[in-house]
Design a protein with these regions (language model features):
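Conserved C-terminal structural/oligomerization subdomain of aldehyde/semialdehyde dehydrogenase
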Residues: 1-18, 104-112, 125, 253-256, ...
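Rossmann-like NAD(P) dinucleotide-binding subdomain of oxidoreductase/dehydrogenase enzymes
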Residues: 166-327
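Short, solvent-exposed amphipathic alpha-helical segments in soluble enzyme
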Residues: 215-218, 300-302, 332-333, 469-472, ...
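Short, flexible turn/loop "capping" segments at secondary-structure junctions
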Residues: 71-72, 307-309, 340-343, 443-449, ...
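Extended hydrophobic secondary-structure segments that form protein cores and membrane-embedded regions
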Residues: 199, 259-265, 347-349, 451, ...
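ALDH superfamily catalytic-core signature
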Residues: 3-12, 37-40, 213, 247-253, ...
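N-terminal Rossmann-like NAD(P)+-binding subdomain of aldehyde/semialdehyde dehydrogenases
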Residues: 1-184, 218
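Generic non-transmembrane alpha-helical segments
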Residues: 116-124, 244-252, 370, 374, ...
Length: 559
């Protein structure tokens, strides 16, 4: 019998499957925070719900023995939210008890409950948006879109991928093999989908929902219980998520400990390593540093580990029709959320002899100046700039800006800005530094996370593309952007992207930016270079989260 929540959301699931097959634009979750869509009071209600959580204890009825929480808004104030402190052993014991009936419920229940959680999360998009804004430093519009509907899109994508794999496995089958003149051999076979076990989702501090939802919902949709361990600097968005998930599970008749929160104070690295190597943790989804991701891949051998780590995203400029349009697009990508996106560009390669344009040749210096001026134009008005660049998530990024200044000649210096609504906000404009491929490779072959970019002189476009491909392959990258009107150069760019295992964008000058990745159409990460060992979202991301156990017995032939 079909689970009622599966039946309730089946049409959405069907549309999601169709969207994945065609790879066109589709989303059931409106990305604009419009009162016509979400309700006239939705924004105010969401903000009030967020404010009501501040300086309070976040109540979750799960095993706990104390309180933790030291989040501080990048916009300049302490959140003061305290969360249940949970010891791993009693928590995992409770999760194991909850896992058993959840596993027996079957795929219709797993999918239906997951989709209901997602619908409830969409209703809470404004509350989540304010929590994302004040833990990550994203400006409100990005916090709403990336933290809400876009994250929900990625969650739905994972659920649809999971269902696509689960539905291929029949519950039972009749098998009959002819035996010539003798009666046929006949068997009845039963196939049971067996989830891997307990999943551990390790969140990051810049995109706590967008990067965590795919793993969380891939686990749930394949029948696994999930322990959500947020980054200590961005607990609240995932705490709200867990609260909603537990409410839905309880209403659906399941133990809410199928989804639990494990909140921590800062400097929790030792605890994370202990959690990740527990024998009962069978799945791990991680977003964060290369160092920590590599440690998990090497040491959490009892689990299947999905990682997204650091990378060096790159732009190659060979030729452009309109340098102003190209520079505007690049500048927006550099400024958006102060470069604190895993897809944000860092290295911009320009031939030292200049580039071709519709108006003639532009020198290397003129190209660098065009980009610098475009960034400056976007950030010159503080009131407008802060709605684009947001705030810096933590002091380590500010310190990194200071170190990057000394790497080369500064084309555009980073400046602190005063936020008109939050006077203590940590706001800094992008830094552009000139480097040279001949002498500075040790400086630009690592990620400089934050509002930091390098305009790098190369001997030729051929060298630029060779660098882009080799750096992606060796050091990791999620995005590569190339500007060229030459079809031969574009073909070499495709080959460099394939060599580097990195997504390629060509000649972006309009309203699409290299940072952006659209669910149901764009694959985020390839798993083909060190930046990530998995893709959001393909069959490989979900299929290994369960196994199939069969039983068979002789029966009388039907014929």
């Amino acid at each position: 019998m079909t689970h009622p929540l599966f039946a309730k959301h089946e049409s959405t699931l069907t549309q999601a499957l169709q969207a994945q097959e065609t790879r066109g634009y589709w989303s059931p979750f409106p990305e604009m925070p419009s009162p016509k869509v979400y309700g006239e009071t939705a924004n105010a209600d969401g903000e009030q719900s967020f404010k009501a959580l501040l300086n309070q204890t976040f109540d979750l009825d799960q095993p706990s023995n104390g309180l933790v929480g030291q989040e501080h808004s990048p916009f300049g104030f302490a959140l003061g939210v305290r969360y249940p402190k949970t010891e791993p052993d009693p928590l995992f014991a409770a999760v194991a008890r909850a896992q058993q009936p959840w596993q027996r419920a079957g795929r219709d229940a797993w999918i239906g409950v997951s989709l209901e959680i997602l619908q409830r999360l969409n209703r809470a998009s404004f509350e989540i948006a304010y929590s994302v804004m004040h833990t990550t430093g994203q400006a409100f519009m990005m916090a709403f879109q990336a933290g809400g509907p876009h994250a929900q899109d990625r969650a739905l994508e994972a659920i649809a991928c999971a269902w696509d794999q689960l539905r291929r496995i029949p519950a039972q089958a009749y098998w009959e093999k002819p035996q010539g003149k003798n009666p046929p051999l006949a068997m009845e076979k039963h196939f049971t989908i067996v989830p891997r076990g307990i999943g551990l989702v390790l969140g990051c501090c810049t995109f706590p929902t967008w990067n965590s939802y795919p793993g969380l919902f891939a686990d749930l949709a394949t029948g696994n219980a999930v322990v959500v361990k947020p980054h200590p600097g961005a607990i609240l968005p995932l705490a709200i998520t867990v609260r909603i998930a537990r409410d839905v599970l309880r209403e659906a008749g399941f133990d809410p400990n199928v989804v639990t929160l494990l909140a921590t104070d800062p400097d929790d690295g030792t605890l994370v390593q202990q959690l990740a190597t527990r024998p009962d943790v069978r799945l791990i989804d991680f977003t964060g540093s290369t160092h920590n991701g590599n440690w998990l891949e090497r040491n959490a051998t009892q689990a299947h580990v999905y990682t997204e780590k650091a990378g060096v995203n790159q732009i190659v400029i060979d030729s452009v029709d309109d340098i102003k349009a190209a520079a505007r697009n690049i500048a927006f990508s550099l400024a958006l959320y102060s470069g604190q996106m895993c897809t944000a560009p860092q290295n911009i390669y320009v031939p030292r002899n200049g580039i071709r344009t519709a108006d003639g040749t532009l020198s290397f210096d003129e190209v660098g100046q065009a980009i610098a001026e475009a960034v400056q134009k976007l950030t010159s008005d503080s009131a407008k700039a802060v709605e684009l660049i947001g705030a810096i998530q933590n002091d380590a990024v500010v310190q990194r800006i200071e170190r990057a200044r000394a790497l080369g000649s500064v084309l555009l210096d980073s400046q602190p800005l005063v936020h008109p609504a939050f006077e203590h906000a940590r706001v800094h404009t992008p830094l552009l530094v000139r480097l040279d491929a001949a002498t500075d490779q040790n400086r630009f072959t690592q990620e400089w996370f934050g509002p930091i970019a390098f305009v790098i002189a190369t001997d030729s476009t051929a060298q630029s593309l060779a660098l882009a491909g080799s750096i992606a392959a060796q050091h990791g990258a999620l995005t590569l952007s190339v500007y060229s009107g030459d079809e031969a150069v574009q073909q070499v760019a495709h080959e460099a992207a394939i060599k580097g295992g990195v997504a390629l964008s060509l000649n972006l000058t309009g309203g699409v930016f290299v940072n952006q990745s659209a669910a149901f159409s764009d694959f985020h990460g390839t798993g083909a270079n060190p930046a990530a060992n998995a893709t959001l979202t393909d069959a490989a991301f979900v299929a290994n989260r369960f196994r199939v156990v069969q039983s068979r017995a002789h029966v009388a032939p039907r014929g």
